[in-house]
Amino acid sequence: MKWTEVKVETASEAVEAISNIMMEAGASGVAIEDALDIENFESDLYGEILDKEQFTHIKEGAIVMAYFPETTFLTEILPFMKENILRLPEYGLSIGKNEMTISEVAESDWATAWKKYYHPVRVTRFLTIVPSWEAYHAQDEAEKIITLDPGMAFGTGTHPTTRLTLQALETVLRGGETVLDVGTGSGVLSIASRYLGAKDVYAYDLDEVAVAAAKENMDLNPIAADVHVSANDLLKGIDHSADVIVANILADIIVLMIEDAWRLLKQDGTFIISGIIEDKKAMVLEALTKVGFVVDQLFNQGDWYAIILKKPEEE
């Protein structure tokens, strides 16, 4: 069997959104080559884990590669992908060159080709993300290993938005909390929350493919076996009160869930948001403070921001 590779040259900030578009179009897998991965590695404060030669050296931007069975009707799905990618700037995401190329890949090449883009990465002081096929052992007692199968490509921990969110969770969680993870994708934030001591974790995603991928990744991490994963539109209809709500999604989508987040957070609860590009930060903060949230901390990597907010206790 042969596979069709659809390759999109884009900007780093659009990688996760384009990956999701490709999966929605029916891709069997997605691989990402991102110049930011090299930058993240070289500036990593948490110790070198990898040999830099494991990364493919592209100088700028990113390449997203999706793989479809040769029987796929590309004439139907290509317009869908192109149209949705062209809409990303409406959400504040640069799509860079946005050049799409198509080629054939043999079955033997497809089986292993995409795996070369994923290796163990220390993403925070305590958390290391390891692909499911890699043999890796903790370097010290404090290191926690999150095992992921990135074949479904819903965030693998190396994108700035994911790393910033993980750092924020590590800052906030002290043990025993109830956490709501909105737009869970791969489930990495929910798994991290359990490793960082959260007692009850609920993970939601509108995309059934993401829900399935998250459940598979929970199975790879026994500590997360009791995470509740389900399909849901943001926090609509949810009635679980929470100590922490975390959302690594587009800024415009975060604004839509602010009132529900306020409703569900306990007094002195914490709202962690990420996926905020510089151009959208002021708009999001204005909407949050209007409801009553108070900014506690900001994290940034380049133009990307994660923000920790508090719901003040009533006087």
From Swiss-Prot:
UniProt keywords, alphabetically: Cytoplasm, Methyltransferase, S-adenosyl-L-methionine, Transferase
EC number annotated for this UniProt entry: 2.1.1.-
Lineage top rank: taxon: Bacteria
Residues annotated for S-adenosyl-L-methionine binding in this entry: 162, 183, 205, 248
InterPro entries: Ribosomal_L11_MeTrfase_PrmA, Ribosomal_PrmA_MeTrfase, SAM-dependent_MTases_sf
Catalysed reactions listed for this entry: L-lysyl-[protein] + 3 S-adenosyl-L-methionine = N(6),N(6),N(6)-trimethyl-L-lysyl-[protein] + 3 S-adenosyl-L-homocysteine + 3 H(+)
One annotated GO biological process: methylation
Keyword Cytoplasm: yes
Subcellular location: Cytoplasm
Main localization category: cytoplasm
One of the Pfam families matching this protein, by short name: PrmA
GO CC field: cytoplasm
Gene3D superfamilies referenced in this protein's UniProt entry, alphabetically: Vaccinia Virus protein VP39
Molecular function terms, GO-annotated: protein-lysine N-methyltransferase activity
Function description: Methylates ribosomal protein L11.
Family: Belongs to the methyltransferase superfamily. PrmA family.
Protein name in the entry: Ribosomal protein L11 methyltransferase
Gene: prmA
